[in-house]
Amino acid sequence: MVLAGLLITPPPRNAAPATAAAPASAAANWTVETGTLGFTVKQMTAEVKGQFTGWTATIAYDESTRTGTVDVTIPIAGMTVGSVTPQAAGPEFFDMAKFPTATFTGTIAETNGQLTATGPLTIHGTAAPISLPFALTITGDTAQMKGQVTIDRRTFGIGANYKDETTVAFPVQIDVTLTAKRK
């Protein structure tokens, strides 16, 4: 997956040349090479695992300050949940026709030795704050990340007609892993 780069508009004709601005930080941009974005939810008494493909991430991270930003776009059409994929993509759950993407925009910071990406997760047209704790290992120009967070599907109106946890549980565990290269 390719990260989005900066778009620089050239100065208008006959304008004085622009001077280069000093970089805002030492944050490096990272290109995601491989990754998985999965989720687990209980349906009746069984765990159901699903995943999203085709997602993209724009990541800037400064190793010296252990801070950064991340923007993730997730196409709901890339969701697979086994035999229940059509139902999960339908109006009762993700309503892919009306809400074709989910997004996460986060700020990365370290607190008490734990890296966390914090910001709004938008699913099904509803934004709610989440904090995704993650482990990060950087070797040379390669970063490996692994994180997990649990959300409540009701917060996002997913399966709103399933008000009883015995059919579809309220908690949904989200797991993300990725390998990225420094640009």
Annotate each predicted stretch with a short phrase:
Residues 4-183:
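Low-complexity, acidic/polar, glycine-enriched regions of mature
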